[in-house]
Amino acid sequence: MKADFMERIDFASAPVSAIERRLLRIADCERRVAAAEAALEHELAPRYSDWADLERIYAAFCNSPHADVTPVERRERFVLIALLLFAPGALLGRSVPRGMGRELSRVLGESKFAVSRCLSSLPLRYRLYMRRKADLWLRDVTERLHNEERGL
């Protein structure tokens, strides 16, 4: 991206102020990207680390309405909640913490196979959903940058 900006500047004929403005804009974009990455790392920090909290969270989850939800959907919803609270990075491709599958299996009262299958399929579906969201966001940001360059 930096090289693309640099190629469009004609250093021989451009006034110094235009070159400086472009370089400042590049530096500002890099600062924003670094800030966004830091915010994402903060968001990916687990909110819980003690597996004992899983039972309390599951009790609260079971007290919420699930009238029209099948047992499989209920399991998927709870596993997604557990991932968001204990290992949000797993939804973006990082590994699930050691022992989480065993504890989920114990709390849910289901087989390790069912829970591990759920743990492996949910992040993929979530990543695909987030990828679509990210593509839309990227398209919007790119369009804004082009409009800014054209002075619109």
Where are the regions a protein language model picked out?
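Major-groove recognition helix of helix-turn-helix-like DNA-binding domains
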Residues: 110-126
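Extended, non-core accessory segments
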Residues: 11, 88-93, 121, 126-128
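Short Lys/Arg-enriched helix C-cap and helix-to-coil transition segments
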Residues: 126-149
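General nucleic-acid-binding
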Residues: 1-58
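Short, Lys/Arg-enriched N-terminal segment that forms or immediately precedes the first helix
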Residues: 55-70
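Short alpha-helical "recognition helix" segments of helix-turn-helix
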Residues: 93-111
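Short, amphipathic alpha-helical "recognition" segments used to contact nucleic acids or chromatin
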Residues: 73-98
